[in-house]
Amino acid sequence: AGMVNICYCLNFPELPLQGNYDDTKYKIYFADSGLLVAMLDEEAQEDLRTSKNLGVYKGALYENVVGEALVKAGYKLYYYKRDDSTLEQDFFVRTASALIPVEVKAKNGTAKSMRTLISSEKYADIHCGIKLTGGNIGYSDDIYTFPYFCAFLLKRYLAGVNI
C-alpha cells in the first residue's frame, strides 16, 4: 500500500538493471521518512528533536531519505553487495549509456566501494559516481558530490550532462 520502498540487490553492477537483480535479496526503506522517525522509541525521538543528535540512526535515516527521494524522482531502487568482499554500494541510477553508483555518507569520508567500481575494468558501465553528504557541491576523481537535499534533483541533473 505504498508504505515501503524495496531496494533489490543487483547480481552484478551492469546494465540493464531490469532482470539483473535477485528478488530474494533486498532492503526495505520507508516510503515516508517521517514515519521512520515516528517509529523510533520516545528517547531517540526526543534526542533527534531537541539536541539534533542522530547518533547510531544517522546513516540509516539519511539512506532512507535518499532512497525516498530517488523513488519520488522516478527511479527504482537497486544496491550491490559482493558476497566475497566488503564491496557494497547503497544505490544505482542510470543514464541512457551509463550506470552510476550513488553513495550516501553520514560522515564526510571516502567512498571506497565507489572508487573500486569506477576504477576497475570489470565494471564497464560505470564511469563516475555520485556521493551525497552533508557538505557542498564538488567534483574530484570522477565523483560528483552533492548535499543530501539535492537527491531529488539527480534525475534532472543527469539529463542535462553527458555521462
List where the protein language model places each region.
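Accessory nucleic acid-recognition modules appended to NTPase machines
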Residues: 1-96
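Short catalytic-loop micro-motif centered on adjacent basic/acidic residues
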Residues: 79, 101-104
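Structural motif
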Residues: 98-102, 128
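Catalytic cores of nucleic-acid endonucleases
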Residues: 106-146
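Domain-level recognition of nuclease-like catalytic cores that cleave nucleotide substrates
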Residues: 135-163
